[in-house]
Protein backbone atom coordinates (compact mmCIF):
# COMPACT_ATOMS: atom_id res chain seq x y z
CA UNK A 1 0.00 0.00 0.00
CA UNK A 2 1.31 3.43 -0.95
CA UNK A 3 1.92 5.75 1.99
CA UNK A 4 -0.22 8.86 2.31
CA UNK A 5 1.74 12.10 1.89
CA UNK A 6 0.57 15.53 2.99
CA UNK A 7 2.76 18.37 1.72
CA UNK A 8 2.22 22.02 2.57
CA UNK A 9 3.25 24.53 -0.09
CA UNK A 10 3.59 27.90 1.62
CA UNK A 11 4.30 29.66 -1.69
CA UNK A 12 5.47 33.30 -1.33
CA UNK A 13 4.08 33.68 2.17
CA UNK A 14 5.55 34.19 5.65
CA UNK A 15 8.49 36.30 6.73
CA UNK A 16 11.35 34.50 8.43
CA UNK A 17 9.88 35.05 11.89
CA UNK A 18 6.38 34.08 10.71
CA UNK A 19 7.71 30.85 9.18
CA UNK A 20 9.44 29.89 12.41
CA UNK A 21 6.33 30.69 14.45
CA UNK A 22 4.13 28.69 12.08
CA UNK A 23 6.25 25.55 12.16
CA UNK A 24 6.69 25.79 15.93
CA UNK A 25 2.91 26.01 16.22
CA UNK A 26 2.35 22.75 14.35
CA UNK A 27 5.43 20.71 15.25
CA UNK A 28 4.20 19.08 18.48
CA UNK A 29 0.78 18.15 17.10
CA UNK A 30 2.18 16.79 13.84
CA UNK A 31 4.71 14.67 15.70
CA UNK A 32 1.81 12.92 17.43
CA UNK A 33 0.43 11.83 14.04
CA UNK A 34 1.90 8.62 12.64
CA UNK A 35 1.42 6.51 9.55
CA UNK A 36 1.70 9.32 7.00
CA UNK A 37 4.49 11.42 5.49
CA UNK A 38 4.33 15.11 6.48
CA UNK A 39 6.20 17.72 4.44
CA UNK A 40 6.35 21.52 4.71
CA UNK A 41 7.74 23.69 1.91
CA UNK A 42 8.53 27.22 3.14
CA UNK A 43 10.19 29.99 1.09
CA UNK A 44 13.92 29.59 0.42
CA UNK A 45 15.07 32.07 3.08
CA UNK A 46 13.28 30.09 5.78
CA UNK A 47 14.53 26.62 4.87
CA UNK A 48 17.62 26.61 7.09
CA UNK A 49 16.00 28.02 10.26
CA UNK A 50 12.93 25.81 9.83
CA UNK A 51 15.24 22.83 9.40
CA UNK A 52 16.81 23.67 12.76
CA UNK A 53 13.39 23.80 14.43
CA UNK A 54 12.40 20.46 12.86
CA UNK A 55 15.60 18.67 13.86
CA UNK A 56 14.59 15.30 15.30
CA UNK A 57 10.99 15.76 14.18
CA UNK A 58 8.91 13.46 11.98
CA UNK A 59 8.17 16.43 9.70
CA UNK A 60 10.16 16.62 6.48
CA UNK A 61 11.29 19.73 4.63
CA UNK A 62 10.86 20.60 0.97
CA UNK A 63 11.84 23.47 -1.30
CA UNK A 64 9.46 25.12 -3.76
CA UNK A 65 11.80 25.18 -6.75
CA UNK A 66 15.38 24.72 -7.91
CA UNK A 67 17.50 25.46 -10.98
CA UNK A 68 18.95 22.71 -13.12
CA UNK A 69 22.59 23.85 -13.00
CA UNK A 70 24.86 23.10 -10.04
CA UNK A 71 26.52 26.53 -9.92
CA UNK A 72 27.43 29.51 -12.06
CA UNK A 73 26.24 32.90 -13.27
CA UNK A 74 22.52 32.38 -12.69
CA UNK A 75 21.59 35.36 -10.55
CA UNK A 76 18.79 34.69 -8.10
CA UNK A 77 18.63 30.93 -8.65
CA UNK A 78 19.03 28.08 -6.15
CA UNK A 79 20.98 24.99 -7.17
CA UNK A 80 20.43 21.35 -6.21
CA UNK A 81 23.78 21.37 -4.40
CA UNK A 82 22.57 24.21 -2.18
CA UNK A 83 19.48 22.22 -1.23
CA UNK A 84 21.15 18.84 -0.86
CA UNK A 85 21.99 19.18 2.82
CA UNK A 86 18.83 21.07 3.76
CA UNK A 87 15.80 19.30 2.34
CA UNK A 88 14.97 15.89 0.85
CA UNK A 89 12.06 17.14 -1.29
CA UNK A 90 11.47 19.83 -3.91
CA UNK A 91 8.36 20.95 -5.80
CA UNK A 92 8.96 21.12 -9.56
CA UNK A 93 6.72 22.30 -12.37
CA UNK A 94 4.05 24.03 -10.30
CA UNK A 95 1.51 25.78 -12.53
CA UNK A 96 2.49 29.15 -11.06
CA UNK A 97 6.08 28.57 -12.17
CA UNK A 98 4.85 27.61 -15.62
CA UNK A 99 2.51 30.63 -15.85
CA UNK A 100 4.58 33.43 -14.32
CA UNK A 101 8.10 32.32 -15.18
CA UNK A 102 7.55 30.59 -18.50
CA UNK A 103 8.71 27.15 -17.41
CA UNK A 104 8.25 24.70 -20.26
CA UNK A 105 8.00 20.94 -20.13
CA UNK A 106 11.64 20.79 -21.19
CA UNK A 107 12.72 23.02 -18.30
CA UNK A 108 10.68 20.92 -15.87
CA UNK A 109 12.39 17.81 -17.24
CA UNK A 110 15.87 19.29 -16.69
CA UNK A 111 14.95 20.28 -13.14
CA UNK A 112 13.69 16.78 -12.34
CA UNK A 113 16.92 15.28 -13.64
CA UNK A 114 18.96 17.74 -11.56
CA UNK A 115 16.98 16.99 -8.41
CA UNK A 116 17.34 13.23 -8.84
CA UNK A 117 21.05 13.59 -9.53
CA UNK A 118 21.38 15.45 -6.22
CA UNK A 119 19.36 12.85 -4.34
CA UNK A 120 16.38 15.15 -3.81
CA UNK A 121 12.93 13.68 -4.42
CA UNK A 122 10.87 15.80 -6.83
CA UNK A 123 7.20 16.52 -6.30
CA UNK A 124 6.24 16.92 -9.96
CA UNK A 125 3.15 19.03 -10.61
CA UNK A 126 0.81 18.58 -13.57
CA UNK A 127 -2.59 20.10 -14.26
CA UNK A 128 -4.91 21.64 -16.82
CA UNK A 129 -6.41 25.13 -17.19
CA UNK A 130 -10.13 25.81 -16.89
CA UNK A 131 -10.67 26.22 -20.64
CA UNK A 132 -8.75 23.01 -21.33
CA UNK A 133 -10.94 21.20 -18.83
CA UNK A 134 -14.13 22.61 -20.32
CA UNK A 135 -12.98 21.70 -23.85
CA UNK A 136 -12.40 18.08 -22.89
CA UNK A 137 -8.60 18.38 -23.23
CA UNK A 138 -7.66 17.34 -19.70
CA UNK A 139 -6.28 13.92 -20.58
CA UNK A 140 -4.39 15.20 -23.60
CA UNK A 141 -2.77 18.00 -21.58
CA UNK A 142 -1.81 15.72 -18.71
CA UNK A 143 -0.35 13.08 -21.00
CA UNK A 144 1.77 15.71 -22.74
CA UNK A 145 2.97 17.18 -19.45
CA UNK A 146 3.85 13.75 -18.06
CA UNK A 147 5.75 12.66 -21.15
CA UNK A 148 7.68 15.95 -21.33
CA UNK A 149 8.50 15.88 -17.62
CA UNK A 150 9.78 12.30 -17.59
CA UNK A 151 11.49 12.19 -21.00
CA UNK A 152 14.80 10.35 -20.79
CA UNK A 153 14.36 9.57 -17.09
CA UNK A 154 14.44 5.97 -15.87
CA UNK A 155 11.90 4.84 -13.25
CA UNK A 156 12.84 6.80 -10.14
CA UNK A 157 11.59 7.82 -6.73
CA UNK A 158 9.29 10.73 -7.46
CA UNK A 159 5.96 12.06 -6.27
CA UNK A 160 3.38 13.38 -8.72
CA UNK A 161 0.86 16.05 -7.76
CA UNK A 162 -2.24 16.63 -9.87
CA UNK A 163 -3.32 20.25 -9.46
CA UNK A 164 -6.11 21.38 -11.77
CA UNK A 165 -5.15 25.01 -12.33
CA UNK A 166 -8.77 26.13 -12.15
CA UNK A 167 -8.94 24.85 -8.56
CA UNK A 168 -5.77 26.44 -7.17
CA UNK A 169 -6.58 29.17 -4.68
CA UNK A 170 -10.11 29.55 -6.03
CA UNK A 171 -11.99 27.61 -3.38
CA UNK A 172 -13.34 25.44 -6.20
CA UNK A 173 -12.01 21.90 -5.85
CA UNK A 174 -12.62 18.95 -8.12
CA UNK A 175 -15.01 16.45 -6.58
CA UNK A 176 -13.37 13.45 -4.99
CA UNK A 177 -14.66 11.22 -7.80
CA UNK A 178 -13.42 13.60 -10.50
CA UNK A 179 -10.01 13.88 -8.89
CA UNK A 180 -9.70 10.12 -8.50
CA UNK A 181 -10.74 9.50 -12.10
CA UNK A 182 -8.13 11.93 -13.40
CA UNK A 183 -5.41 10.59 -11.13
CA UNK A 184 -6.24 7.06 -12.29
CA UNK A 185 -5.56 8.27 -15.82
CA UNK A 186 -2.26 9.86 -14.74
CA UNK A 187 -1.31 6.51 -13.23
CA UNK A 188 -2.13 4.81 -16.53
CA UNK A 189 0.08 7.28 -18.42
CA UNK A 190 2.86 6.69 -15.91
CA UNK A 191 2.49 2.97 -16.57
CA UNK A 192 2.85 3.59 -20.30
CA UNK A 193 6.07 5.55 -19.67
CA UNK A 194 7.70 3.58 -16.85
CA UNK A 195 5.80 0.30 -16.68
CA UNK A 196 3.14 -1.06 -14.35
CA UNK A 197 5.40 -1.65 -11.35
CA UNK A 198 6.51 1.99 -11.17
CA UNK A 199 2.94 3.09 -11.78
CA UNK A 200 1.66 1.03 -8.85
CA UNK A 201 4.23 2.29 -6.32
CA UNK A 202 4.48 5.98 -7.28
CA UNK A 203 2.45 8.26 -4.99
CA UNK A 204 0.10 10.67 -6.75
CA UNK A 205 -1.31 13.56 -4.73
CA UNK A 206 -4.23 15.90 -5.33
CA UNK A 207 -3.86 19.65 -4.94
CA UNK A 208 -6.24 22.52 -5.51
CA UNK A 209 -8.25 24.10 -2.68
CA UNK A 210 -7.65 21.17 -0.34
CA UNK A 211 -9.04 22.00 3.09
CA UNK A 212 -10.32 20.47 6.31
CA UNK A 213 -13.76 19.88 4.80
CA UNK A 214 -12.78 17.87 1.71
CA UNK A 215 -9.65 16.02 2.86
CA UNK A 216 -11.27 12.84 4.17
CA UNK A 217 -13.43 12.33 1.09
CA UNK A 218 -10.50 12.92 -1.26
CA UNK A 219 -8.18 10.54 0.58
CA UNK A 220 -10.76 7.74 0.71
CA UNK A 221 -10.41 7.42 -3.06
CA UNK A 222 -8.44 4.45 -4.37
CA UNK A 223 -5.85 6.31 -6.44
CA UNK A 224 -5.31 9.48 -4.38
CA UNK A 225 -2.27 9.09 -2.13
CA UNK A 226 -2.29 12.42 -0.36
CA UNK A 227 -2.52 16.14 -0.90
CA UNK A 228 -0.42 19.13 -1.87
CA UNK A 229 -1.97 21.79 0.34
CA UNK A 230 -1.73 25.51 -0.36
CA UNK A 231 -3.58 28.12 1.69
CA UNK A 232 -4.69 25.68 4.39
CA UNK A 233 -1.05 24.88 5.18
CA UNK A 234 -0.51 28.47 6.36
CA UNK A 235 -2.64 27.89 9.45
CA UNK A 236 -1.22 25.43 11.93
CA UNK A 237 -4.59 24.16 13.12
CA UNK A 238 -5.83 23.58 9.55
CA UNK A 239 -2.72 21.72 8.43
CA UNK A 240 -2.71 19.59 11.58
CA UNK A 241 -6.38 18.75 11.03
CA UNK A 242 -5.72 17.72 7.43
CA UNK A 243 -2.82 15.50 8.51
CA UNK A 244 -4.89 13.97 11.30
CA UNK A 245 -7.70 13.14 8.88
CA UNK A 246 -5.18 11.62 6.48
CA UNK A 247 -3.84 9.36 9.21
CA UNK A 248 -7.37 8.33 10.19
CA UNK A 249 -8.10 7.21 6.62
CA UNK A 250 -5.44 4.50 6.90
CA UNK A 251 -6.39 3.25 10.37
Swiss-Prot record:
One of its GO terms (molecular function) is triose-phosphate isomerase activity. Pathway: Carbohydrate biosynthesis; gluconeogenesis; Carbohydrate degradation; glycolysis; D-glyceraldehyde 3-phosphate from glycerone phosphate: step 1/1. Keywords: Cytoplasm, Gluconeogenesis, Glycolysis, Isomerase. The active site is at residues 94, 163. CDD domains: TIM. Its EC number is 5.3.1.1. It is an enzyme of class 5 (isomerase). It is found in: Cytoplasm. One of its GO terms (cellular component) is cytosol. It holds the Pfam family TIM. Substrate binds at residues 9-11, 169, 209, 230-231. GO terms for biological process: gluconeogenesis; glyceraldehyde-3-phosphate biosynthetic process; glycerol catabolic process; glycolytic process. It catalyses: D-glyceraldehyde 3-phosphate = dihydroxyacetone phosphate. Involved in the gluconeogenesis. Catalyzes stereospecifically the conversion of dihydroxyacetone phosphate (DHAP) to D-glyceraldehyde-3-phosphate (G3P). Belongs to the triosephosphate isomerase family. Homodimer. This is Triosephosphate isomerase.
